[in-house]
């Protein structure tokens, strides 16, 4: 429809081939992501600001703000939801629920769900909510108060109180209802059979800064679960994936959250002793489809769902401790020559202790037993009369010497 504005998003190669030609007599404008010198978050930030400046502003001037009718609810924009960001559908659904729960209404969701002809209506909101800290530039341009979408119980409560203060609303009735409704399962999960492991079940997370900071703050700050490491993927910088692989090998967190990269690094550890850590998708890239609205991470509903996933991950870890029947049948018989009084050198025992310390507390007993039997069998097979340090280090695999030095 030539009467409606339209945008064609092109890439560098298409621009070189097409020469930037725009059909005459159309309202098509071109937006070129700088695919060579910026990442997807920088491109998203620039695209959102460009769309508003091109289709919302008039010659660089802000459009006039429509006065809110007497008695109408305060209005809020939600900025950031778009294809290609992790868990967007569920988190958007939860943020909308929070906004409407305290008595406000959503003015616009930008860019997903917004039309180019509606860009000038962005200024009609009384406040803005930025869902992802990686691209918040449009909130600065709009000039209204804005808040970061929350993750965790305490953060959500603080968010609602601040939003209520900005909009002139009382969020306390909604906050008081949450423990008896949305947050009620948190109590059940916290008192479940996995409660014995919360104090020792460490976790690691590698995700965009929005999720890495928020999830760590919730699990470690609100709930007290020990965090082995948290690596944030930030706009404008490249993640050191080799360092991430090293952190996973060094700490062996019982629960690992991340992208397909971290899932691959986790698979590399399967040859080791002890149970396998559980993986929870928390970032792109990865083959994780999250189009349903039942898997939030943000808000009160996100606090409930996230704790549920951690509990399920702990059950998975317990499952891996148990040997499968087929594995027991196919395993080699225990050598009768193994003796509990088989002599060990002191440095060999120290090396074994260092390996066991890499395992979560929950799984150390089974890991220590398996490693000790494997070391003694290797020594007997080699015709040795005692277990030496080199035998233990050989069980750990390549690179153990470097990690051993780090732990000393």
From Swiss-Prot:
Keywords: Bacteriochlorophyll biosynthesis, Chlorophyll biosynthesis, Oxidoreductase, Photosynthesis. Its EC number is 1.3.7.15. It catalyses: 3-deacetyl-3-vinylbacteriochlorophyllide a + 2 oxidized [2Fe-2S]-[ferredoxin] + ADP + phosphate = chlorophyllide a + 2 reduced [2Fe-2S]-[ferredoxin] + ATP + H2O + H(+); bacteriochlorophyllide a + 2 oxidized [2Fe-2S]-[ferredoxin] + ADP + phosphate = 3-acetyl-3-devinylchlorophyllide a + 2 reduced [2Fe-2S]-[ferredoxin] + ATP + H2O + H(+); 3-deacetyl-3-(1-hydroxyethyl)bacteriochlorophyllide a + 2 oxidized [2Fe-2S]-[ferredoxin] + ADP + phosphate = 3-devinyl-3-(1-hydroxyethyl)chlorophyllide a + 2 reduced [2Fe-2S]-[ferredoxin] + ATP + H2O + H(+). One of its GO terms (biological process) is bacteriochlorophyll biosynthetic process. InterPro entries: BchZ (IPR010244), ChlB/BchB/BchZ (IPR050152), LI-POR_suB-like_C (IPR013580), Nase/OxRdtase_comp1 (IPR000510). One of its GO terms (molecular function) is oxidoreductase activity, acting on iron-sulfur proteins as donors. Pathway: Porphyrin-containing compound metabolism; bacteriochlorophyll biosynthesis. Gene3D superfamilies: Nitrogenase molybdenum iron protein domain. Chlorophyllide reductase is composed of three subunits; BchX, BchY and BchZ. Forms a heterodimer of one BchY and one BchZ subunit. Converts chlorophylls (Chl) into bacteriochlorophylls (BChl) by reducing ring B of the tetrapyrrole. Belongs to the ChlB/BchB/BchZ family. This is Chlorophyllide reductase subunit Z.
């Amino acid at each position: 429809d030539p009467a409606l504005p339209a945008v064609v998003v092109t890439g560098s190669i298409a621009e070189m081939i097409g020469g930037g030609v725009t059909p005459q007599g159309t309202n098509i404008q071109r937006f070129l992501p700088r695919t060579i010198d910026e990442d997807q978050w920088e491109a998203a930030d620039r695209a959102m600001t460009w769309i508003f400046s091109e289709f919302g502003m008039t010659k660089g001037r802000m459009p006039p703000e429509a006065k809110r009718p007497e008695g109408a609810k305060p209005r809020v924009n939600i900025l950031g939801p778009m294809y290609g960001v992790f868990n967007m559908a569920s988190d958007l659904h939860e943020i909308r629920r929070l906004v409407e729960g305290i008595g406000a209404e959503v003015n616009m969701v930008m860019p997903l769900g917004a039309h180019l002809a509606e860009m000038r209506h962005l200024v009609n909101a009384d406040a803005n909510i930025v869902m992802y800290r990686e691209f918040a530039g449009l909130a600065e341009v709009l000039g209204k108060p804005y808040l970061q979408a929350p993750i965790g119980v305490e953060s959500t409560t603080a968010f609602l109180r601040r939003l209520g203060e900005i909009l002139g609303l009382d969020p306390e009735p909604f906050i008081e209802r949450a423990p008896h409704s949305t947050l009620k399962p948190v109590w059940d999960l916290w008192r479940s059979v996995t409660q014995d492991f919360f104090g020792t079940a460490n976790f690691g997370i590698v995700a965009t800064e929005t999720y890495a900071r928020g999830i760590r703050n919730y699990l470690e700050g609100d709930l007290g679960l020990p965090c082995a490491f948290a690596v944030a993927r930030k706009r404008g910088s490249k993640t050191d994936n080799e360092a991430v692989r090293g952190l996973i090998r060094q700490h062996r967190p019982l629960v690992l959250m991340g992208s397909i990269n971290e899932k691959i690094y986790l698979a590399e550890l399967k040859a080791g002793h002890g149970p396998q850590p559980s993986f929870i998708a928390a970032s792109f890239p990865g083959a994780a489809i999250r189009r349903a609205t039942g898997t939030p991470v943000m808000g009160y509903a996100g606090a409930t769902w996230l704790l549920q996933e951690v509990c399920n991950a702990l059950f998975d870890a317990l499952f891996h401790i148990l040997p499968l029947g087929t594995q027991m049948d196919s395993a080699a018989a225990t050598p009768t020559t193994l003796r509990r009084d088989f002599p060990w050198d002191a440095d060999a025992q120290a090396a074994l202790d260092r390996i066991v310390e890499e395992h979560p507390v929950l799984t150390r007993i089974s890991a220590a037993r398996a490693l000790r039997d494997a070391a003694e069998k290797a020594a007997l097979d080699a015709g040795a009369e005692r277990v030496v340090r080199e035998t233990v280090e050989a069980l750990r695999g390549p690179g153990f010497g470097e990690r051993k030095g780090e732990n000393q």
